[in-house]
Amino acid sequence: MRQISPAQLAQRLSDPQQPAPLLLDVREPWELEICRIEGSVAMPMGSVPARFSELDRNRETVVICHHGGRSAQVCMFLERQGFSRVINLAGGVAGWAAQVDPRMAQY
């Protein structure tokens, strides 16, 4: 499974020469109310098995959760379903807040 650090993702998102990946946030709705990375799409982990057909298998997808554990599980699931361009955000939104956006609310 590929991983990307929050700092690497921020750099990638700021590069207009690169196509933006889908930011798939698999946290629960109550977590999204606290904080989220701008532009992310919500799909709680428990709904992924029923909804993964909504995702583009050919689009690079960065999967996000609180610390990186749930997103790693979703990455592995998506890879088993034939998705080859999934990347886990190492450290999740907690890492994003620590490395990229210190103003982001944490929990």
Which positions does each model-derived feature cover?
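Rhodanese-like catalytic fold shared by cysteine-dependent sulfurtransferases
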Residues: 1-21, 28-60, 70-107
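Short, surface-exposed ligand- or partner-binding patches at beta-edge/loop junctions that are enriched
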Residues: 64-65
